A protein has these predicted regions:
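N-terminal beta1-alpha1-beta2 submodule of the flavodoxin-like/Rossmannoid cofactor-binding fold
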Residues: 1-96
Length: 96
C-alpha cells in the first residue's frame, strides 16, 4: 500500500486550511493510500531551538534524537503533502 505523510500546520480547527487538510486526508484514504496524518500543533511540536540544543548543534546524534520520530515518519512515506497557510508572504513559524 502506498503511504503518504500529510503534514498540517495551522492552529485553528475552523480554518480554511483545516478544511483543506480534511479533504486531502479523506481523498487519499478513499483512493487507497495509507495516511500518516501529522498535525504539528496537535502533537505539540516544539520548533524553537533551546540553548542546550544550540550548544550541541554540531553533535549529530543529539540533534537527530530530538526529531527522530518525525524523521522516521518521513522516511516511511512514499509521498509528502504539506497543508499550511501563507502568512505575511511565508509559512507558519512551526514549519521553520
Amino acid at each position: 500500500m502506498t503511504r503518504a505523510l500529510v503534514l498540517f500546520a495551522h492552529p485553528c480547527p475552523e480554518s480554511f486550511s483545516a478544511a483543506l487538510h480534511a479533504r486531502v486526508v479523506g481523498t487519499l484514504e478513499r483512493r487507497g493510500w495509507q495516511v500518516d496524518d501529522c498535525d504539528l500543533n496537535a502533537e505539540n511540536f516544539q520548533p524553537v531551538l533551546t540553548e542546550t540544543e544550540r550548544r550541541g548543534y554540531h553533535d549529530d546524534p543529539a540533534n537527530i534524537a530530538a526529531v527522530q520520530p518525525y524523521v522516521q515518519r518521513l522516511r516511511a512515506a512514499d509521498a509528502l503533502v504539506m497543508v499550511f497557510p501563507v502568512w505575511n508572504f511565508g509559512y507558519p513559524a512551526i514549519l521553520k
